[in-house]
Amino acid sequence: MSSSQNFPYLPASSPRSADVVLYLDLNGVVHHEKVLWHPRKGIYMSPYEAAGHSLFEWVPILESLLEPYPAVALVLSSTWCIRPGYSATLKRLPASLRARFIGGTYHKHVHGVDPWNLSMFRTTPRGVQVQDDARRRKPRQWLALDDDLEGWPDSCRENLVACEGTTGLSNPVVQHELKEKLRGCHAGLSA
């Protein structure tokens, strides 16, 4: 769980960093993975593949799991960083979660805005995106909550809490794993 084995500890000296960071994907984590986008409708659940589901339906579970750990910061690691964008995404989340966000894995200042750079970012495996961001932020501890399991570097797999895209955080096994890893991060800071 700790990235301090690979990187020297540097205290969180700016609002863009924190001692403990949770990299949060959205699709397949806080709601069903079958999300669609339309230029006029925006983002919505597939009425065929995710009937009965709604956007952000499992957010209350995340809020509950994070409540004992007010110092845990969130970083958006999702395609939502690009569309609809970081700021627009945060507006859709409850205030309790918005206050925890310190950024996203996609940064216009880091990755640029030209189509080639955007394409390169989109084709980079999620685990590599998260690893690169963790190297920039240098948190003492970090975790990732994601249903995109392909291409994660072996050195980062212990930080990953893997979700199944149709059940995400509604799965009690995932909830238990996240709870235990958050507890471990907290204990690691106290040691």
Q: What do these predicted ranges mean?
A:
Residues 8-11, 15, 60, 68, ...:
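Proline-rich intrinsically disordered, low-complexity coils
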Residues 9, 15-112:
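Alpha-helical substrate-recognition element adjacent to the catalytic core
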Residues 3-13, 63, 184-191:
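A short, highly charged, low-complexity intrinsically disordered segment
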Residues 87-191:
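C-terminal cap/substrate-recognition subdomain and adjoining C-terminal extension
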Residues 1-2, 32:
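N-terminal amphipathic/basic-hydrophobic helices that include classical n-h-c signal peptides
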Residues 5-7, 23-26, 141-142, 150-152:
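Aromatic-residue detector
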Residues 2-22, 131-138:
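Short amphipathic alpha-helices and their capping/turn segments at secondary-structure boundaries
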